[in-house]
C-alpha cells in the first residue's frame, strides 16, 4: 500500500530530524515510551474512552467533551494522546485524563500494538486527525470512532480525483461532528453521510474558561482605572512591529504583550522596541507594576484570563503561518484584531462578518482602526458587543454531540 510506504519514509525522516531538532527528539522519545506507559498505567478491566489531539489547540476543542463525559459517565476512564510535544508537554499532567501519552506513528505494527494495549471502548479524533491505519484497525475491531469539530475544504485530498483510498478512510468513522454545512456537502459528495453540523466545541470551552477566569492582582494593579488597555496575545515579531510603534506614540493607552515565544532573546527583542516603561510579569511587584506602561507576560498559562483586562485585543500569527485563538479574546466582549492569514479559520470569518473581528493588512490599517477605537467609545463598545455575542450565539456543540454519542 502506497500509504504505508509513505509512512515508513516519514518515520525514517522523523528519526533523522530528531538528531538535530530538540522538539522532534522529544516527540520520538515520547512515542517510544508510549507503549511502556500503556503497559504500566492501563487497567485491563476498565473501559477506556480514547481521545486523540494533534496538539494543544485541538486538545482544547476536545476538552469540553472529555469533562462532560467524566461528569455524566464516571464509570469510564479517559486515555488522552498527543502527536506534538507542544500539546503533550503542556497537558501531560491533565487531571481530566487517567492516562496521557504520545501516539506512536501510524505504521501497521505500531497501530496493532497500541490498540492491543489500550483496548479502547470508543475513540474520538479531534479536528484534522485522519490516520489511515489507526482508523482502519478501529473499524476492523468494531470499536466506535468519532470525528469531533472537523472541518473540510475542497482542496483536501479526500475530494481530489487522486484521493480514492483516502476517501475510504473517512468511512471508518461512525459519525463526523463537523463545523459547517459546506463540510456536510463535501462529505456527501464522496458518499460519507453519517454527519451532523454541531459547530465548534471551542465556543463552549471559551465560555467555560471565561466563567472560571483567574483573578490576577498584579495585572489588575497594572491596568489601573485611567487608560484603555490593549492586550496582544500569542504575538510574533511581525505582529509586534505593527502594534509596538503605535503604543510608543500613544500615551493614552497601556499595553500587555503575551508573546507566543518567551525565550530570553525574543523578550529582549521586544523590550528593545519599546520606548515606554516596561516590566516583566515574573519580575513585577505591586509597586513597580503601577509605574509601567507595558506588561510583558513571560510565562505560560495566563493568556486566556488576561484578555479580561483589555478593552481591545490583538491575536498574533496572522502575518506568519496562521492566527492563534481569537475566541479566547472575543468571549470577553472586546474587539479582536488579527493579520491576513486567517482564511482557514471559520471563527475568524464569523468575527469579521459580525464586525467583532477586524483583519489588517499592515501598519496603516492597524493605525487607522486603533485611532477609530480610541476616539469613538460607541464604536468600540459595539465592536466588543458583537464579538461577545458571536461567541455566545455559536455555543452548544457539546450538547449536540452528547445527544448523539451512545455510552
Identify what each model region corresponds to:
Residues 142, 311, 333:
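A short alpha->beta transition loop at the rim of the catalytic pocket in nucleotide-sugar-dependent
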Residues 304, 327-332, 349:
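Short alpha-helical segment that forms part of, or immediately flanks, the ligand-binding pocket
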Amino acid at each position: 500500500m502506497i500509504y504505508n510506504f509513505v509512512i515508513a519514509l516519514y518515520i525514517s525522516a522523523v528519526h533523522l530530524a530528531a538528531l538535530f531538532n530538540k522538539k522532534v527528539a522529544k516527540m520520538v522519545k515520547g512515542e517510544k515510551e508510549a507503549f511502556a506507559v500503556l503497559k504500566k498505567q492501563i487497567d485491563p478491566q476498565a473501559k477506556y474512552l480514547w481521545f486523540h489531539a494533534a496538539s494543544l489547540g485541538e486538545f482544547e476543542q476536545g476538552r469540553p467533551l472529555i469533562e462532560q463525559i467524566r461528569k455524566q459517565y464516571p464509570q469510564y476512564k479517559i486515555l488522552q494522546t498527543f502527536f506534538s510535544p507542544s500539546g503533550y508537554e503542556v497537558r501531560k499532567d491533565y487531571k481530566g485524563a487517567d492516562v496521557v501519552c504520545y501516539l506512536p506513528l501510524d505504521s501497521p505494527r505500531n497501530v496493532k500494538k497500541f490498540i492491543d494495549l489500550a483496548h479502547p471502548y470508543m475513540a474520538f479524533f479531534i479536528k484534522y486527525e485522519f490516520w489511515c491505519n489507526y482508523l482502519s484497525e478501529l473499524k476492523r475491531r468494531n470499536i466506535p470512532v468519532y470525528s469531533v469539530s472537523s472541518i473540510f475544504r475542497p482542496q483536501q485530498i479526500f475530494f481530489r480525483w487522486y484521493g480514492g483510498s483516502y476517501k475510504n478512510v473517512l468511512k471508518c468513522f461512525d459519525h463526523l461532528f463537523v463545523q459547517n454545512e459546506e463540510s456536510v456537502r463535501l462529505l456527501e459528495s464522496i458518499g460519507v453521510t453519517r454527519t451532523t453540523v454541531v459547530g465548534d466545541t471551542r465556543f463552549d470551552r471559551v465560555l467555560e474558561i471565561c466563567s472560571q477566569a483567574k483573578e490576577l492582582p498584579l495585572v489588575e494593579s497594572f491596568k489601573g482605572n485611567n487608560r484603555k488597555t490593549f492586550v496582544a496575545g500569542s504575538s510574533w515579531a511581525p505582529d509586534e512591529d505593527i502594534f509596538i510603534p503605535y503604543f510608543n506614540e500613544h500615551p493614552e493607552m497601556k499595553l500587555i504583550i503575551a508573546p507566543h515565544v518567551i525565550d530570553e532573546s525574543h523578550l529582549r527583542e521586544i523590550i528593545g522596541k519599546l520606548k515606554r516603561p516596561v516590566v516583566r510579569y515574573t519580575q513585577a511587584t505591586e509597586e513597580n507594576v503601577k509605574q509601567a506602561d507595558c506588561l510583558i507576560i513571560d510565562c505560560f498559562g495566563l493568556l486566556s484570563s488576561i484578555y479580561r483586562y483589555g478593552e481591545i485585543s490583538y491575536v498574533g500569527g496572522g502575518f506568519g503561518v496562521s492566527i492563534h485563538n481569537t475566541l479566547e479574546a472575543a468571549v470577553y466582549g472586546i474587539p479582536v484584531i488579527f493579520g491576513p492569514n486567517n482564511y482557514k479559520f471559520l471563527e475568524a470569518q464569523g468575527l469579521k462578518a459580525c464586525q467583532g473581528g477586524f483583519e489588517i493588512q499592515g501598519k496603516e490599517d492597524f493605525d487607522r482602526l486603533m485611532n477609530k477605537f480610541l476616539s469613538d467609545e460607541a464604536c468600540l463598545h459595539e465592536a466588543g458587543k458583537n464579538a461577545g455575542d458571536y461567541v455566545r450565539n455559536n455555543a452548544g456543540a457539546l450538547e449536540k454531540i452528547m445527544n448523539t454519542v451512545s455510552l
